[in-house]
Amino acid sequence: MCIRDRRLLGDASIIRNETKIRAAINNAKATIALREEGGLAEFIWAYQPPENLYPTVMEDIPKKSYESKLMSRELKKKGFRFVGPVTCFALMEAIGMIDTHLIGSHRRGTSGVWLESGVPNYGLAQEYNALANSQTAGADELHGAAS
């Protein structure tokens, strides 16, 4: 374990689990490697399901999906760790890729990712990818190209 990792284990503001710290560092490296294939945003958005969910009660909301299982498997093939299908599904919810807000909720549809017809707003997903890629390029310029 290097000095940086020991310092992280003593940081009370983060999870102090050595395996998870190593996984976070590893996943950052895997994210950088994905830039050669279009970047993490492009990779993630490739798993957007063809239809939205329509939950009317909390029990209708799954913990994982076919797409989150695929995403998890492919992320692991790319070297990512601690990215199971439940974690991938939570990511998909967090970025609006799937809308698990209950029908009738004031939050339903606020991401703009889904059209009222229930099909994806692919134009918006492309805008998200372009924004993510431009921010990645800016970070490279700011910190020097990743090696």
What are the functions of these language-model segments?
Residues 1-3:
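Short, small-residue-biased leader/transition segments that mark boundaries at the very start
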Residues 75-95:
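Helix-hairpin-helix
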Residues 14-43:
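Structured, non-catalytic alpha/beta "coupling" segments that mediate domain-domain communication
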Residues 23-26, 70, 87-90:
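Amphipathic alpha-helical interaction segments
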Residues 35-82:
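Helix-hairpin-helix/helix-loop-helix acidic hairpins
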Residues 6-9, 25, 72, 76:
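Amphipathic alpha-helical segments within well-ordered protein domains
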Residues 11-12, 66, 70, 99:
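Terminal-region recognition feature
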Residues 93-134, 138-147:
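C-terminal end-helix/capping segment
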